Amino acid sequence: MNERIIIFDTTLRDGEQSPGASLNVYEKLEIARQLAKLKVDVIEAGFPVSSPAQFEAVKRIADESEVIIAGLARAKEIDIKAVYNALRNAKKPRIHTFSSTSDIHILGKFGDSKYGASLEEKRKTILKMSYDSIAYAKTFCNDVEFSAEDAGRTDIGYLCDIIETAIEAGATTVNIPDTTGYTFPSEFGFKIAELKRRVRNIDKVIISVHCHNDLGLAVANSIIAIQNGARQVECTINGIGERAGNASLEEIVMALKVRNDICNYYTDIDITEIYNTSRMVSGFTGIVVQPNKAIVGENAFAHESGIHQDGMLKNKQTYEIMTPESVGVNKTKIILGRHSGRHGLKSRLGELGYHPSEEDMQKVYEAFLELADKKKEVFDDDLRVLMGDEIYKKEELYELQYLHVTAGTDTIPTATIKIRSNEKVIQESCTGDGPVDACFNAIERALEIRPTVESYNVRSVTSGRQALGEAIVRIRNGENSFTGRGTSTDIIEASAKAFLQAINQYLLFTKTNLEFHEDELIIRNV
């Protein structure tokens, strides 16, 4: 008989830790709604204690979601209380706490003698800290998950000890992360099997796994873990995450479905929503899906070889083990124009996973008409970009109101801008080493800020001569990096928008963190 696998999506927590993938509250809400439509079982919405923005995002998602919402916490009371406060209105809250367990992590993070003079003493300290944190979390929430950080490199004997301790303290899910993506499937499968064999009362909890992709083995390790007793997998849309990323949700789900002949497991995922979810996450994070990415890449269902094309024409199953339609790829292009009407636009946005309020819909419709005047034909990818732009505008401090650029072979590039903030309009002109540099210089002069530009990229996000171009700019100011995205049929305008958005992200970060104190998260809403 087939057994159900719980899908724990951590796109909004671990996935957002991808360099440059910062999401605002409204973007996180849209993604959470789409994840619910995808029918994931658990959404890990963030790390509430880390910042006011994280706290607010977790709270907003928890307030409206029907699925299990998890918040991450270190093995500290302040973290756990912050998660509780963020999730207190959730219909199905989960507190997710963790402790370091590998020798290299223990010696690196708990080197101080107050944790013990020897490795063995430090291990005992961590056992007690883990027990206490889980027991404390249980006073707020029945559903508590414990993660043994860097379990992939943790001695199996100590891993069994800490998992047994977690179960005794009341954990309902025990998570075994391959934090550094170090293990081979044979090793990881053995580890899960040993936990099943050696840990008392392991049958009373859910075994979860969280695999990173540093060696390209995250999905393989997740599958082998399932075959050895894991019943929850933690994963992200498009496999995004720190370093080389996490196990890809779409790859795990489709592997279990396509190979159900040898894997007697299933998920509740609505696979027809996979493609829309992938494109939404890519659009909001600015992380492009590689063309040859399994399941959701642009080339995933493309066949160029003559032999392959001939085989496909005769029988699609010759070279396709799943259909593009099964994962939500619409082969029939739906084209909208300025005569499509508000209802037609709203209907198509809903099909793509976007559900703007009536107030927001008016702004979206006006932006759609403006785009339709420029492009004549508006495709799904245009709508995804449009929604990303409109959701971002909810949090901007400064808006680009006007831009005029002169440039040419015998002309000094000059940019004139007008930036609006509330009722105030700032105008500046600057020259530069090219039109983009001139725009950046004018914005810097207007806002009296000069960050370091770490990276600047431009790409086409739709097709044809009138395609929308997207600029992605990453800036650094002090220790923090901020990413801005801008789109337009004019790449110079897109670049200016992206640079201004990155500065807006920095200014919002500075503003909220100046007002932030750890005590606020403990007492808020109590």
Q: Each PLM stretch: what is its role?
A:
Residues 3-7, 14-42, 55-64, 77-207, ...:
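Alpha/beta enzyme core
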Residues 4-5, 11, 254, 260-429, ...:
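A mid-to-C-terminal "edge-of-domain" accessory segment
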Residues 12, 47-48, 74-75, 99-100, ...:
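Short, ordered loop/turn segments at secondary-structure junctions
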